[in-house]
Regions:
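Alpha-helical cap/lid subdomain in secreted, periplasmic
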Residues: 75-216, 220, 224-236
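Gly/Ser/Thr-rich beta-alpha loop segments that engage phosphate groups in nucleotides
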Residues: 26, 65-66, 96
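Flexible loop/turn segments at secondary-structure boundaries
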Residues: 30, 66, 155-156
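Short clusters of hydrophobic/aromatic residues that line enzyme substrate/ligand-binding pockets
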Residues: 28, 70, 206-207
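Short, solvent-exposed loop/turn segments at secondary-structure boundaries
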Residues: 32-36, 69-71, 159-164
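Functional beta-strand-loop-alpha-helix junction segments that form "active/interaction loops"
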Residues: 59-72
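Serine-esterase "nucleophile elbow" of acetyl-processing enzymes
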Residues: 1-61, 77-89, 105-109
Length: 238
């Protein structure tokens, strides 16, 4: 990740108003958020559904980051420095939480000493859920309201339906949200179900690459799904 990318990330247009900060990877904000390569994240279209005279929508997601690396690279600290009581933080991770840089699997309190492949330094590695809890607790400590989203699905078809990732990031996100008592939007299942209904031909137009990054139409579709997911919550914080 570009260690100076956060300097170019947006700030609240009207600092006196409450702000909704978006935290995540390139499926939320791709590159500079300008449609480079035809790719757009859903966070670029979410402001269309809010009254921007009453709330800021600030897309601070960074491509290539995961639940641990967004913390370790200082992107989260740059947000908490701006958080104030009455703000909201919407968090979606999982697409970059595999391989050598992945946290430990699960949501428990296990930890291991690991060598960071980027820095070569040794340090403790926690579970995926442990890291997600840090966002929730630090947001609350600032008087902000966290909202957890499961990761949007990849375009992988299996037996005519979008493949779900069982016992993985989507389920862990739900479990942590329930344990911490925060709002949860199951984007993984909600969008997958909508893709199933629409079918492969139309869904193909929603993607700018083979299976992960969305086109403008796909990002707009996913932003609408975020809003739909919020609207059906028993206690919608927004």
């Amino acid at each position: 990740a570009d260690s100076f990318a956060w300097l170019r990330l947006p700030s609240a247009a009207k600092p006196a108003l409450p702000s909704l900060f978006l935290v995540g990877d390139s499926t939320v904000r791709t590159g500079r958020g300008d449609g480079g390569g035809g790719q757009w994240g859903w966070g670029e279209y979410l402001p269309n559904y809010f009254d921007l005279a009453r709330i800021n929508v600030v897309n601070r997601a960074v491509g290539g980051t995961g639940v641990r690396t967004f913390l370790d690279t200082g992107y989260w600290a740059a947000i908490t420095a701006k958080l104030k009581p009455g703000d909201f933080v919407m968090i979606q991770f999982g697409h970059n939480d595999n391989g050598a840089r992945a946290p430990l699997k699960g949501i428990g309190d296990e930890r291991e000493e690991r060598v960071n492949p980027a820095t070569k330094a040794s340090g403790p590695m926690h579970t995926w859920g442990w890291y997600l809890r840090q966002y929730i607790r630090e947001a609350r400590a600032k008087g902000a309201t966290p909202i957890i989203c499961s990761l949007i699905p990849r375009k992988i078809w299996k037996d005519g339906k979008i493949a779900r990732t069982a016992d993985s990031h989507a389920d862990w996100a739900r479990a942590i949200a329930q344990a911490e008592g925060v709002a949860f939007v199951d984007l993984h299942e909600l969008i997958a179900r909508r893709y199933d209904e629409i079918g492969p031909e139309k869904v193909n137009a929603f993607f700018a690459d083979e299976r992960v990054h969305t086109s403008a139409a796909g990002a707009e579709f996913n932003a609408a799904s975020v809003v739909a997911g919020l609207q059906v919550l028993a206690k919608n914080p927004l």
